[in-house]
Design a protein with these regions (language model features):
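N-terminal transmembrane-helix/juxtamembrane module of multi-pass inner/ER membrane proteins
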Residues: 1-59, 96-115
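Alpha-helical transmembrane segments of multipass membrane proteins
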Residues: 5, 9, 87-92, 96, ...
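Juxtamembrane loop-transmembrane helix junctions in multi-pass integral membrane proteins
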Residues: 34-44, 70-73, 123, 152-155
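Alpha-helical transmembrane spans of integral membrane proteins, capturing the lipid-embedded, hydrophobic core
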Residues: 57, 81-89, 165, 190, ...
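Membrane-embedded catalytic cores of phosphoryl/pyrophosphoryl-handling enzymes
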Residues: 110-225
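Interfacial segments of alpha-helical transmembrane regions
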Residues: 66-91, 161
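Hydrophobic, membrane-inserting alpha-helical segments
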Residues: 35-52, 79-85, 117, 198-201, ...
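Membrane-water interface at transmembrane helix exits
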Residues: 59-66, 92-100, 144, 148, ...
């Protein structure tokens, strides 16, 4: 339901006239220098970063193939990952639909940035917070947590965590360079993605310990442990 509402709100966003555009002086002090920025190549590269989303599932599939995890583990992990991605996306769209401030490129006064601003859709006027950064850190944290759970004694744990978080941070940086988001958008997006991942993982951990389900012909039920 949250996802549906988020999508509805997101695509219902309307353009803001230049006279109603928030003045640069009202942006956060550390964000103002980025108003008017636009980069086509950074926009393209940041969009392709979506391929990183397969990393957690690829890792889970590899673990299953190698026998380090079973089909139940793979299914549970996939379910949690889908839940986390859907939740972070819905939350992002709900917040962005408030149109707290516009994307940096909307303030462009010349060149390609100006042309993009003139043809921008309503979503361009809701920059806060970065969905790309949120998604990237959701993926990064899930990858690190899954690897740590399946291979708790691996010498590569630190490398996996460092690589995942570095790639996620790079996605956020590209969104700033592209003129799609301000530093504040990226920082908050990173925290939201991390929080959603850890929250979903913790919730399933609690449910796994405190709830037992059974099902057989003519009967289905659950036991809650307190």
């Amino acid at each position: 339901m949250t996802s549906v509402l988020g999508v509805y709100q997101y695509y219902g966003m309307s353009r803001i006239s230049s006279s109603d555009l928030k003045p640069k002086s009202e942006l956060l002090p550390w964000d103002r220098p980025f108003a008017g920025r636009y980069s086509g190549w950074a926009t393209t590269v940041s969009h392709y970063s979506g391929v990183l989303a397969v990393a957690p599932l690829a890792l889970a599939g590899y673990s299953w193939y190698k026998g380090d995890a079973d089909g139940h583990d793979f299914g549970a992990f996939t379910l949690m990952f889908v839940e986390a991605v859907a939740l972070q996306n819905a939350l992002n769209q709900l917040v962005r639909s408030s149109q707290l401030w516009s994307r940096p490129f909307v303030y462009s006064e010349r060149g390609e940035g100006r042309r993009k601003a003139e043809s921008a859709r309503g979503e361009a006027y809701g920059s806060f917070y970065s969905g790309h950064a949120s998604a990237a850190f959701t993926v990064a944290v899930f990858t690190g947590e899954w690897f740590s759970e399946i291979y708790p004694n691996s010498q590569y744990k630190s490398l996996v965590w460092a690589s995942s978080l570095t790639l996620a941070a790079a996605v956020g940086a590209l969104r700033v360079v592209a003129g799609k988001h301000y530093p504040t958008d990226v920082v908050v997006g990173s925290l939201m993605g991390t929080g959603v991942s850890l929250g979903i993982l913790k919730l399933h951990e609690i449910c796994k310990k405190n709830i037992a389900f059974w099902a057989f012909p003519g009967n289905i039920g659950a036991i809650f442990y307190f």
